[in-house]
Amino acid sequence: MVDVNRFKSMQITLASPSKVRSWSYGEVKKPETINYRTLKPEREGLFDEVIFGPTKDWECACGKYKRIRYKGIVCDRCGVEVTRAKVRRERMGHIELKAPVSHIWYFKGIPSRMGLTLDMSPRALEEVIYFAAYVVIDPKDTPLEPKSLLTEREYREKLQEYGHGSFVAKMGAEAIQDLLKRVDLAAEIAELKEELKSASGQKRIKAVRRLDVLDAFNKSGNKPEWMVLNILPVIPPDLRPMVQLDGGRFAASDLNDLYRRVINRNNRLARLLELNAPGIIVQNEKRMLQEAVDALIDNGRRGRPITGPGSRPLKSLSHMLKGKQGRFRQNLLGKRVDFSGRSVIAVGPTLKMYQCGVPREMAIELFKPFVMREIVAKEYAGNVKAAKRMVERGDERIWDILEEVIKEHPVLLNRAPTLHRLGIQAFEPVLIDGKALRLHPLVCEAYNADFDGDQMAIHVPLSEEAQAEARLLMLAAEHILNPKDGKPVVTPSQDMVLGNYYLTMEDAGREGEGMIFKDKDEAVMAYRNGYAHLHSRVGIAVDSMPNKPWKDSQRHKIMVTTVGKILFNDIMPEDLPYLQEPNNANLTEGTPDKYFLEPGQNIQEVIDGLDINVPFKKKNLGNIIAETFKRFRTTETSAFLDRLKDLGYYHSTLAGLTVGIADIPVIDNKAEIIDAAHHRVEEINKAFRRGLMTDDDRYVAVTTTWREAKEALEKRLIETQDPKNPIVMMMDSGARGNISNFSQLAGMRGLMAAPNGRIMELPILSNFREGLSVLEMFFSTHGARKGMTDTALKTADSGYLTRRLVDVAQDVIIREDDCGTDRGLLIRAITDGKEVTETLEVRLQGRYTRKSVKHPETGEVLIGADQLITEDMARKIVDAGVEEVTIRSVFTCATRHGVCRHCYGINLATGDAVEVGEAVGTIAAQSIGEPGTQLTMRTFHTGGVASNTDITQGLPRIQEIFEARNPKGEAVITEVKGNVVEIEEDASTRTKKVYVQGKTGMGEYVVPFTARMKVEVGDEVNRGAALTEGSIQPKRLLEVRDTLSVETYLLAEVQKVYRSQGVEIGDKHVEVMVRQMLRKVRVMDPGDTDLLPGTLMDISDFTDANKDIVISGGIPATSRPVLMGITKASLETNSFLSAASFQETTRVLTDAAIRGKKDHLLGLKENVIIGKIIPAGTGMARYRNIEPQAMNEIEVIDHTEVSAEAE
């Protein structure tokens, strides 16, 4: 066997007849499979042991030779070689075809490769191959045209006219084979290149296509006649097995049926040829043989598929590769693994962040070999067999051994669907009773898990390296930040938030207000004994917390705080300021001075002069975690998170918050608000009846009225709510629910959507406290159902989007430290109209500068060129008033097959500079795909007059951008740089004309009458600027402007969609994806290079081809950039393995075989398919074979000294 980790590339070509014979171990002559009485394979049949190898290890068919000692001997009685039975998965046979047969992939594929090679139409080919017409192969001296078709009748007439032997015409695949042998590749190519110089239109397109195929044959060394088969390979029998079922019947792979048909027809043809049967019978048999081989290779590609019992189409060789159940996606990219299990998950509130609870029964099964090894080592059992029995019996001693084995041995937990890399994390197992896996509550957010019956899978990493990677790279405590935006992903939720919210509340006049304590213990004692309340404002000596970063003016004073906040600050890391107010200033700059008593001040007076602070909410806790991570990194943060979780749970239990119907308030003026709305609607309808407004206007006015009524109720609800109301506390803290839920309970439900997505005019006036009427209940069911179906559709759509994104970017890996490019990207804040969707500060964080950034007023250099911009530096740059900065960007990176560290910036998941080997493409794809489910599915119909265009938003818009489709509601763009001089309206054609005066001439643009203008007369516009509202078509923009403009536009558009839904995604992820869409160019004029016009190729390959020509003084080729949608980009990748496993498997493989393509295994997918370690992370060549070295020589202490001390 080839060592899979040793070879560099993999090539696929057409198989020549001699190649097929060299693979084969013998000819299959009979259609029989196995003898139904003896159940032994038949000689010369499809399962013959002589050809394919023995069915039992080290045993020949007749039984003369048994055992391994006869290895390699061929039995003299039955002719079977004594070897392993697994050779039946590797050894191939062959069938000698009695007539040539065309390969359906090359004749039927689009475009037809045979047709292009011979310059014949696919229809003509079909007539010849299936014996409906003759084709002239050699006209000799007759006036017949070569390759012209003749019907049976015409053929006979011509024979009579010119005489026998005066010309050669044949039918069937044999004729095509003869024609293919006559093709002179070099001459044809030269002729076509000459023709291209003058051709245009359809003629040119056809010539380019033909040239492409002929050139592929010429360069790859494949011969065109190999597209016709004279010998058919038979795949190994264990890949098309036959299994006996319980009832004595057999279940066989469909391939066996298909092979049997081929063999039967081939044998019948051989017999007919021997008997010199009439030509028409032979022709018919040849046609049937051709159809049988077609069905074997790709059943159903031509005509009706061959069906098995119950009219089910049989699965051919092509079907074995295609689709989700095909070889690529079912067996090569996703395999089932051993040492795994799955169970329901339950919450484990007492676990540490890096632990998970594993049921004992599960653990003993998963770690069985490890336990057995220890049992033998401890001599509880003599051998492995006895140890296994001991484990299966459930001997008492195994549990102690199991405890030892799992110590320090991490396990992986995975929850499907794994939308991003945090869907698999490592934990240290803790043995528990019961049958459910226990999960730490804080990792739920990363997994998107809840405890309503979710299941999770558990895997055991076996090798030392796998364990080390699990512990160092995948441990849950390491994954504090979300790779998509660099924000903490482990923020506390629900009970934890509520507990900390309640704990940090302040209240005036509670028991114990104004007491002063010397330290925390005293405060807790007073609280426990009922002298002070958690919410009472009290004093505490600052000196009792000496490690906090106090200002000098604050030391040795008394600080006003609450008992709850003393407890809350006790769990904080010591170097963090004492948190008194829930804001960033307190967190970063320290506790405000107003809380400290000056000597001789009365504490009560100070307390009375202070406002009551709001408690710490979910968002504040997130900020605290982010700050902690920034300062102390993972270890301290995960320990702090555990303390925060415990404190939150403890106090939410203690607070005893409950919800009853009495907690839902009644709004006093609800009736008035609703009456006023009714009155307004009546007026609107009256105006409509009088013809003062259109139906569209009326609809908009009515829905607006009800929306305003609901908002008025909401506003009233917020004004009158009691901050101690449990529902308000849950809502305000961010633990559960929002104002919309609250207003449905206490205000009114409002307007509902009808099944067609249009909003119904009749609102639901009741709320859930009052209860809905039957009609209202019925109205509200529409929305509920739509919600359910939308979610289901959205999940599938979002998953497919993620799959396409991963496919297009899976080979983008950080390959080097610095690519040394001199290009950069000029960035400013992303705006949508007047609204800022993404600030400059956020865009700058974690990127490298391309040029130095200067203060706009003083001119001082804020940061030099090629420096990393930290959060603080980004804030400093923006505060200085800088509006645009040139940064290093993935767009402008010059690294081949990936990105360099400087162009990428920091790794958002760690907050440090990205490492070489990081699979940033996959991370980018997951970061964009994972929030896909949170985006809406709707295409908004903006009602009525406002505009007549539908604005696509949410997930459909993201798909539109990444697939580079023509957008809905397309904007008109200008091709001229200049000024808008006139906008004239033409009522007769219902259009407007916009005139733009440029330096070279005037641009005239016709826009629909109803389109909303983005420009006014006198505005200055650049090329590619939108004149009307709507989305710009990126392909059009690429024609008018340059690649970078398109990249910047696409980046901004993606960010607008996500940010408008409140989802934050790092720019760099979008940059990685967009760069992949623009990595190809189309050759326009080949110049002196040997490139073909119209060829699609990588920018880097194109540059290389030109470089050589320029050096030798020739004319370089010209090209234009091409924008491809992600599906197309995935299929155009350099790796045929990756493309074939994505979509259109047969087309990709057909093309790759003709070109003799080489896959250099640069991406992740290709390596997974062939079972090689992926070239990312620790699998990169530079990280393999690293020997650990001590940093400095370790001093060895003399043993005698140690022993002397010990005495």
From Swiss-Prot:
This one is known as DNA-directed RNA polymerase subunit beta'
**UniProt KW RNA-binding keyword:** no
Positions with a binding annotation for Mg(2+): D450, D452, D454
The cofactor required is: Mg(2+); Zn(2+)
What GO terms in the biological process aspect are recorded for it?
DNA-templated transcription
Keyword Metal-binding applies: yes
**Which InterPro entries does the UniProt record give?**
DNA-dir_RpoC_beta_prime, DNA-dir_RpoC_beta_prime_bact, RNA_pol_asu, RNA_pol_N, RNA_pol_Rpb1_1, RNA_pol_Rpb1_3, RNA_pol_Rpb1_3_sf, RNA_pol_Rpb1_4
This protein's encoding gene:
rpoC
Keywords in alphabetical order, please.
Answer: DNA-directed RNA polymerase, Magnesium, Metal-binding, Nucleotidyltransferase, Transcription, Transferase, Zinc
